[in-house]
């Protein structure tokens, strides 16, 4: 499945939660979900009963949309999560959070994961001093993530850091905002990752 290219706020209303797809509007409280917290379309406010499979599929789609991951990539991450010791669902979320595009987003260098992905693919991000343009790269503990020198004054990056300053930085990352770099200090615990995803349903779906 290709990445979703449609109206993202309509998508958020369909899922009923913020997917952090519209950065500035979300942070300013002006998103469509803030104004109309029900599904889109003529029958958006009507409640319908969903099957177990429907709930599982919806949860997977929600996670893919939130993190901007294709079906092929998502399944590959699930396979790795299932291979690791521990809870598969928790492993899944922790692995996704280690993706380079997500880490750039978490550091506040972009207001959305989509914008963070563009920074990476266009070569504006350094990992341990070397340019890395692979959004799916899994960041390791202790690695330094930095915006390239020529990009540090980019208006979009500066604006993103102004907007994200109000939301704070997750506890597994240290950021030097003035110098526009951060350290991925450790792998996150599941309870630290605040996302509206029930990974248990995703595990159930892939385990069929």
UniProtKB/Swiss-Prot annotation:
Domain (S4 RNA-binding): residue spans on this chain:
98-161
Q: Which Pfam families match?
A: Ribosomal_S4 (PF00163), S4 (PF01479)
Task: Identify the domain of life.
Answer: Bacteria
- CDD domains noted in UniProt: S4
SUPFAM superfamilies recorded = Alpha-L RNA-binding motif (SSF55174)
Stretches of the chain forming a coiled coil according to its record: none
Any single Gene Ontology cellular-component annotation = small ribosomal subunit
GO molecular function terms listed in the Swiss-Prot or TrEMBL record? rRNA binding; structural constituent of ribosome
The UniProt entry's sequence similarity note says:
Belongs to the universal ribosomal protein uS4 family.
Function statement: One of the primary rRNA binding proteins, it binds directly to 16S rRNA where it nucleates assembly of the body of the 30S subunit. With S5 and S12 plays an important role in translational accuracy.
Q: How does it assemble?
A: Part of the 30S ribosomal subunit. Contacts protein S5. The interaction surface between S4 and S5 is involved in control of translational fidelity.
Q: What is this protein called?
A: Small ribosomal subunit protein uS4
